[in-house]
Amino acid sequence: MIIIISGPPGSGKTSVAIKLANELSYKFISAGKIFRDIAQKMGLDIINLNKVAESNFDIDKMVDKKIFEFILSEKNLIIESHIAGWLFREYTNIAIYLWAPLKIRANRIAIRDKISYDQAISQIIKREYMHYKRFNKFYGIDINDLSVFDLVINTSNVDVNNIVKLILTYLSSVSQNPQPLKEKDINDK
């Protein structure tokens, strides 16, 4: 089964995806890690690579290609990505969206990245604005449309372990192996 975990910065998607992958003994891949690796190779931080990506679609295509290669080659996979739910939904079994209010996400990011709360707020707003513009421009995606997701979870007042339990309960309640909407074909992406 291939499961997508999407959501905005600070929603808990990486922590939840890693824990879920461990619980299910699935392979885990992170679009954010792929993106950060590209940034590091280019000598940029995330904000500046996002700025470059606004005018250079090749950066997003590199990330997308890498993710799609995993989709084609893995049977049991957890994909953590801001936009995989929209891009790859038709090739996967389950798509989950995690979210939390901006203040909670900023607090999490401030603690995680050891920056001030105000810096975290500023970073999130910049990243989300860049994501919204870029994903709409290049993919025609409205990241506010959550209709592609099977499950949407507010992570505000729930810890990672309980979110994973909730997801596992959901997975046990759906068809043993919900089918992707489309057969995997390398020529598609």
Swiss-Prot record:
GO terms for molecular function: ATP binding; CMP kinase activity; dCMP kinase activity. InterPro entries: Cyt_kin_arch, Cytidylate_kinase_dom, P-loop_NTPase. It is found in: Cytoplasm. It comes from the Archaea. GO terms for biological process: pyrimidine nucleotide metabolic process. SUPFAM superfamilies: P-loop containing nucleoside triphosphate hydrolases. It catalyses: CMP + ATP = CDP + ADP; dCMP + ATP = dCDP + ADP. NCBIfam families: cyt_kin_arch. Belongs to the cytidylate kinase family. Type 2 subfamily. This is Cytidylate kinase. It comes from Saccharolobus islandicus (strain L.S.2.15 / Lassen #1) (Sulfolobus islandicus).
